[in-house]
Amino acid sequence: MTGIFCIFMWYLLLILYMGQIKGVFGTYEPITYKTGCSLWGIFFIISGISIIRATWYPSQRQLTCAMLENILCMILAIISMILTIVELSTFKSVSYRNYGQAKLGRQISRVLLSFYPLEVSMALTYSIFGCVGLCRKKEDARTADTEEVEDAF
């Protein structure tokens, strides 16, 4: 759900920044918009799909893929947080015509900054439970092998 929210916020920023007028001081083009940080929400959607798939069809491969995708999502969310903090800490002057759009864009970045820790915590939680699931699968396989060997004697 947070991935979809981030993608919609990026779309709002796209519409907002496309309407800028080239002024004396130029247009406002933040680093998070150029890198498409909000578009990285697609990775959170893909990760959620893999978690659902691993729940429906549990296997070691599915759990490993879901866990690796969650780790990737954590890394991307941390990078997004850092880029957003850098964007919000610096503000170059823009044309007075674009000031309102730049101000609104910075407010959207502040909203997104509050969602990135949520994404990190959700991905971390799912990664921890994925590790627990993998450990249980390995323990169940070991006990099943031990029982088969004991039954053979």
UniProtKB/Swiss-Prot annotation:
<keyword id="KW-0812">Transmembrane</keyword>
<dbReference type="GO" id="GO:0007166">
    <property type="term" value="P:cell surface receptor signaling pathway"/>
</dbReference>
<feature type="transmembrane region" description="Helical">
    <location>
        <begin position="71"/>
        <end position="91"/>
    </location>
</feature>
<comment type="function">
    <text>May be involved in signal transduction as a component of a multimeric receptor complex.</text>
</comment>
<keyword id="KW-0472">Membrane</keyword>
<feature type="transmembrane region" description="Helical">
    <location>
        <begin position="111"/>
        <end position="131"/>
    </location>
</feature>
<comment type="similarity">
    <text>Belongs to the MS4A family.</text>
</comment>
<feature type="transmembrane region" description="Helical">
    <location>
        <begin position="1"/>
        <end position="21"/>
    </location>
</feature>
<keyword id="KW-0675">Receptor</keyword>
<dbReference type="GO" id="GO:0005886">
    <property type="term" value="C:plasma membrane"/>
</dbReference>
<keyword id="KW-1133">Transmembrane helix</keyword>
<protein>
    <recommendedName>
        <fullName>Membrane-spanning 4-domains subfamily A member 13</fullName>
    </recommendedName>
</protein>
<feature type="transmembrane region" description="Helical">
    <location>
        <begin position="36"/>
        <end position="56"/>
    </location>
</feature>
